[in-house]
């Protein structure tokens, strides 16, 4: 038996149903820590700057402005904070106050690496690049016994994006670039199961899944005046179909029979958002 779930990385990515949190810039669960140099200038003009190999991710056309072979790498450390504040929630069946354990700080420390390499070939007419980064991620983990444990106790989503790219100059002023993204995504969701009606301690459920899929990005840069560039970039959505398992622990035999709470295969659809950007530099 397989259980299917449809998820979306858009708007607010699972924020209510799975209690996941992240730094948000309009697409819900996207991470901005994809370039050390970009972070240093708040990504101003990212689609047109083309100052180092991280342009592979922001606009591969920018590789034509890099000479020889160049490499850049970064490691970003993110300390997230996520707290739940209750205002007197009650049990809908008994009317009693659920409790006062608000779960503490569900955030944590996360390490986000990136790596980019660009080299020229064809007597300097063409560029090839390879980028590896983590465009989506982070998660939550609440204290044991917290009042929302039947919704979520732990949630985690990690991605790895492998982005080879090619670029060339169409004219002296126009550069064109195209890249492909081989993207891996891994998700883990955990929650407790209420068995107090049967006089038993909580059981637990854990959903895991992962998958690989393909996307693409491309862009142009037009140098309309010396040292002045206009850039356009598009990155496609990637439609993931995670395959994994649902595992239960400590479930009473009666609930296994009545509610079907037995280990089974599971699938979940996660759609990452497309993005369009335009910059002047």
Residue ranges: model-predicted function:
Residues 15-24:
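C-terminal segment of classical bacterial N-terminal signal peptides
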Residues 62-63, 77-81:
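Short active-site-proximal "capping" loops at secondary-structure junctions
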Residues 1-10:
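Bacterial N-terminal signal peptides that target proteins for export
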Residues 43-46, 70-79, 102:
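Short strand-turn segments of transmembrane beta-barrel domains in outer membranes
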Residues 25-42, 46, 84, 91-102, ...:
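Outer-membrane beta-barrel porins/channels
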Residues 47, 51-61:
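Periplasmic N-terminal accessory/gating domains of Gram-negative outer-membrane beta-barrel systems
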């Amino acid at each position: 038996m397989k259980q299917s779930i449809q998820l979306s990385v858009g708007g607010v990515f699972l924020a209510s149903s799975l209690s996941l949190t992240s730094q948000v810039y309009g697409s819900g669960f996207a991470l901005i820590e994809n370039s050390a140099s970009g972070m240093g200038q708040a990504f101003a003009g990212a689609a047109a700057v083309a100052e180092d190999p991280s342009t592979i991710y922001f606009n591969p056309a920018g590789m034509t402005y890099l000479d020889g072979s160049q490499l850049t790498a970064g490691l970003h450390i993110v300390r997230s904070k996520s707290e739940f504040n209750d205002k007197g929630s009650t049990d809908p069946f008994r009317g009693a106050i659920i409790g006062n354990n608000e779960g503490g700080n569900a955030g944590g420390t996360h390490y986000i690496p990136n790596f980019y390499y660009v080299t020229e070939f064809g007597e300097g007419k063409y560029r090839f690049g390879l980028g590896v980064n983590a465009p989506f991620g982070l998660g939550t983990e609440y204290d044991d016994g917290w009042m929302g444990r039947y919704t979520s106790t732990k949630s985690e989503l990690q991605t790895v994006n492998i982005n080879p790219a090619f670029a060339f100059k169409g004219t002296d002023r126009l550069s064109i670039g195209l890249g492909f993204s081989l993207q891996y995504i891994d998700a883990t969701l955990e929650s407790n199961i209420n068995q107090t009606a049967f006089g038993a301690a909580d059981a637990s459920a854990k959903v895991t899944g992962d998958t690989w899929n393909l996307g693409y990005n491309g862009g142009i840069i037009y140098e309309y005046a010396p040292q002045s560039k206009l850039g356009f970039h598009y990155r496609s959505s990637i439609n993931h179909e995670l395959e994994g398992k649902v595992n239960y622990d400590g479930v009473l035999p009666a609930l296994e029979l009545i509610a079907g709470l037995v280990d089974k295969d599971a699938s979940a659809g996660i759609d990452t958002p497309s993005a369009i950007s335009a910059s002047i530099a």
